[in-house]
From Swiss-Prot:
Enzyme type, top EC level: transferase
GO cellular component: cytoplasm
Protein name: S-adenosylmethionine:tRNA ribosyltransferase-isomerase
Principal subcellular localization: cytoplasm
Enzyme Commission number: 2.4.99.17
Associated pathway: tRNA modification; tRNA-queuosine biosynthesis
InterPro entries: QueA, QueA_dom1, QueA_dom2, QueA_sf
GO BP field: queuosine biosynthetic process; tRNA wobble guanine modification
Organism per entry: Ruegeria pomeroyi (strain ATCC 700808 / DSM 15171 / DSS-3) (Silicibacter pomeroyi)
Family statement: Belongs to the QueA family.
Subunit comment: Monomer.
UniProt keyword terms in alphabetical order: Cytoplasm, Queuosine biosynthesis, S-adenosyl-L-methionine, Transferase
Function: Transfers and isomerizes the ribose moiety from AdoMet to the 7-aminomethyl group of 7-deazaguanine (preQ1-tRNA) to give epoxyqueuosine (oQ-tRNA).
C-alpha cells in the first residue's frame, strides 16, 4: 500500500482559514455507500435515525503557543532572546515537553519569561524538545496560560495568518471539558447548542469520551509503504459509563457514529478485545485500509490532507475508491478543507 495511493490535488484557495458562522451553517457532504448528497450541518438530524449515538471528544484545547524572553547571564550582563514555545504535553512530574524556536538559543537552567505572572525554567533539552517547569500549577497556571497563550492553529492555517482572540472561541468545541489538547477535534467545531437540541429531539443520543489531541496529528507520513508508518501516541479515556452506553446502543441495533477521527480512534482502541470496554492510556492506533472496525458504524469528519493518516482512516472506513470519488466531488463543488472547513458524514454501505 503506497503513500502515493492517498494523494490528490487540492487548490490552495479551498483551505479554510476561518470557520463558517454560525457553526452549523457549514456544508455537509453525506456519503451513504456509493451515493453522495450535498447538505448543511444544521440538517444533520435529517440524515440520522432515532437510536443513533454520536460519540463526542470532550477534550479542551489549551492556548499552547507562547512567546517569551529567555534570560541569560553573561560577563557583559543579562542577555535576552525571543523564544516561541508550543506546549506538547504534560509529564507525570508536572513538567511540560515543548517545541522551542529557536531551540539552539536555549540551555538547561535558563528561564523564559512569558508575562508578569508566567515563567518557566528549562530543565532539559532532549530529542529536539525542551522540558519546561512553570512557576505556577493548577488553576493559577491555567489562568496565566489563558492570558499569555495563543491557540495552536494547525500549520496550514498558521502559514496564512496569526492566531487571534477569535480563535480562542472558534477553535474550541461547545462541550470542551478536560484540558490537555494542542489541536481541536475539528469535526466537533460544527456543533452548537441549537443543533444538539435538534438532534436530541430526533432521538439521537450522545456519549462523551476524552482524547487529548497532540501536535503529532499534523506530522507527515515519510515512508512510501504506509503499513510501516509509526503513529504518534495520544492519551485517552473511555469511562465505564461511556463504554456501557456504546455497548447498549450496539445491542439495541442502533448505530455508533463518532464525531471526528479522534473519537473513532479512541473507541476502536477500547475495543481491540472484540467489544467496547472501559479504557485509559496512550493509544498509537493506526487505521488504514484493511482495518477491522469493531465499534464505529460511520463517521462525521472534516476533509483531510493528501497523504495523511486521517485520509487513510476514512479510506479504511469507506473504501479507497469511494473516498477518491467523495474527495473529487468535494473539490469540484468547492467544499472548504481541513480544520476550519466543511464536514462529511460517512456511512458505509
Amino acid at each position: 500500500m503506497k503513500l502515493s495511493d492517498f494523494d490528490f490535488d487540492l487548490p490552495d484557495d479551498l483551505i479554510a482559514t476561518r470557520p463558517a458562522q454560525p457553526r452549523s451553517s457549514a456544508r455537509l457532504l453525506v456519503a451513504r455507500g456509493d451515493a453522495i448528497s450535498d447538505a448543511v450541518v444544521r440538517d444533520l438530524p435529517d440524515w440520522l435515525r432515532p437510536g443513533d449515538r454520536l460519540v463526542l471528544n470532550d477534550t479542551r484545547v489549551i492556548p499552547a503557543r507562547l512567546s517569551g524572553t529567555r534570560q541569560r547571564q553573561s560577563a557583559q550582563g543579562p542577555v535576552t532572546a525571543r523564544i516561541e514555545i508550543t506546549l506538547l504535553e504534560p509529564r507525570a512530574d508536572g513538567s511540560w515537553s515543548a517545541l522551542a524556536k529557536p531551540l539552539r538559543k536555549l540551555r538547561e537552567g535558563e528561564t523564559i519569561i512569558f508575562s508578569n505572572d508566567l515563567s518557566a525554567d528549562v530543565e532539559a533539552i532532549e530529542d529536539g524538545q525542551a522540558l519546561l517547569r512553570f512557576n505556577l500549577t493548577g488553576p493559577d497556571f491555567d489562568a496565566a496560560l489563558a492570558q499569555a497563550g495563543a491557540m495552536p492553529l494547525p500549520p496550514y492555517i498558521a502559514a496564512k495568518r496569526a492566531a487571534d482572540e477569535q480563535d480562542k472561541t472558534d477553535y474550541q468545541t461547545v462541550w470542551a471539558r478536560h484540558s490537555g489538547a494542542v489541536a481541536a477535534p475539528t469535526a466537533s467545531l460544527h456543533f452548537d447548542d441549537t443543533l444538539l437540541a435538534a438532534l436530541a429531539a430526533h432521538g439521537v443520543t450522545f456519549t462523551h469520551v476524552t482524547l487529548h489531541v497532540g501536535a503529532g496529528t499534523f506530522l507527515p507520513v515519510k515512508v512510501e509503504d504506509v503499513t510501516t508508518h509509526k503513529m504518534h501516541a495520544e492519551w485517552g479515556r473511555v469511562s465505564a459509563e461511556a463504554a456501557a452506553e456504546i455497548a447498549a446502543t450496539k445491542a439495541a441495533g442502533g448505530r455508533v457514529i463518532p464525531v471526528g477521527t479522534t473519537a473513532l480512534r479512541l473507541i476502536e482502541s477500547a475495543a481491540r478485545g472484540g467489544q467496547i470496554a472501559p479504557w485509559e492510556g496512550d493509544t498509537d492506533i493506526f487505521i488504514y485500509p484493511g482495518f477491522d472496525f469493531r465499534v464505529a458504524d460511520g463517521l462525521m469528519t472534516n476533509f483531510h490532507l493528501p497523504k495523511s493518516t486521517l485520509l487513510m482512516l476514512v479510506s479504511a472506513l469507506m473504501g479507497q475508491e469511494s473516498i477518491r470519488k467523495i474527495y473529487a466531488h468535494a473539490v469540484e463543488n468547492r467544499y472548504r478543507f481541513f480544520s476550519y472547513g466543511d464536514a462529511s458524514l460517512l456511512l458505509p454501505g
